[in-house]
A protein has these predicted regions:
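A short, amphipathic edge element
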Residues: 27-47
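A short coil-to-beta-strand element that immediately follows conserved catalytic motifs
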Residues: 152-161
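Acidic, metal-coordinating catalytic segment for phosphate/diphosphate chemistry
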Residues: 43-90, 99
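Nudix hydrolase/Nudix homology domain
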Residues: 2-28, 35, 104-119, 123, ...
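Conserved Nudix-box catalytic region and its N-terminal flanking loop in Nudix hydrolases
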Residues: 73, 78-143, 165, 196
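Active-site-adjacent beta-strand/loop module that shapes the phosphate/pyrophosphate-binding cleft
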Residues: 59-64, 167-188
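Short, well-ordered beta-strand micro-motif
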Residues: 57-59, 88, 179-181, 204-206
Length: 239
């Protein structure tokens, strides 16, 4: 068996183990002789939190020839989708979700995100225009705006903004970013938002406010990346 066949077999064996857990396959093993960290095999798989993620400890060879280990985090169900980050414009304003983040011990203001199987499948098939409200992982946003507002909401456009690595150092996670424009009944929206500053977990910001809050209220990498991608796209449109 040639060296190439051996490497192909090794990659196939590793990817089969990942596939059995619904994890995203490796694209390549890397080659130490070319200055890359080369994957030799799987040492351990830690799936104690597999509902959300799985950590895979790989045996590796470093460019200097020494061998060791490197742990990579994979998204749950990453074989199907690494999730979606949705820049949602409600009647032209950015929908921002306020929520408690246990790991930070604080409230944050974020762009909505969730599991995006239907979005990713539609993108691959070139069928984004066929999506319905129920196909979007709107989560808190939909709950907070309420059935009265969302019942007649209309998707006017869905644009794929790109796939951006979450943490290229340790995570094999590359979520999709989308710009979703929703039109809702303005009177119903005003009624829902009126006097809601203290209890409603959804804020609607104009473009100026969204830009101003980058690095301030918007302080997570998903949200900052999403707003940057969306504003670049919006500014590229013909006027």
């Amino acid at each position: 068996m040639s060296a190439t066949e051996t490497r192909e077999t090794r990659l196939s064996t590793i990817n089969q183990s990942l596939k059995e857990r619904g994890l995203k396959p490796l694209r390549k093993l890397g080659l130490a002789e070319m200055g890359e960290i080369e994957i030799l095999g799987i040492q351990e798989i830690h799936d104690h939190s597999k509902r959300f993620f799985t950590d895979v400890k790989f045996a590796v060879k470093f460019p200097n020839g020494t061998e060791g280990a490197f742990t990579v985090r994979f998204n749950a169900n990453g074989e199907v989708s690494d999730g979606a980050v949705l820049v949602v414009l409600v009647n032209g304003k950015f929908a921002i979700v306020k929520q408690w983040r246990l790991v930070l011990g604080q409230w944050t203001y974020e762009i909505p995100r969730g599991f995006g199987e239907k979005l990713d499948q539609a993108r691959i098939k070139g069928a984004l225009g066929t999506l319905k409200i129920a196909d979007l992982p709107l989560g808190t946003l939909a709950r907070e705006l309420g059935e009265e507002v969302m019942r007649d909401a209309e998707i006017t456009s869905v644009t794929h903004l790109g796939n951006i690595a979450e943490n290229s150092g340790t995570h094999a996670v590359t979520p999709s970013y989308f710009l979703v424009q929703l039109e809702v009944d303005e009177k119903k929206l005003e009624t829902r938002l009126k006097g809601s500053e203290d209890w409603l977990s959804v804020k609607l910001w104009d473009l100026k406010t969204a830009r101003r809050e980058i690095g301030r209220k918007l302080c997570d990498n998903h949200s900052i990346t999403a707003v940057a991608l969306a504003t670049a796209y919006i500014e590229s449109l013909p006027r």
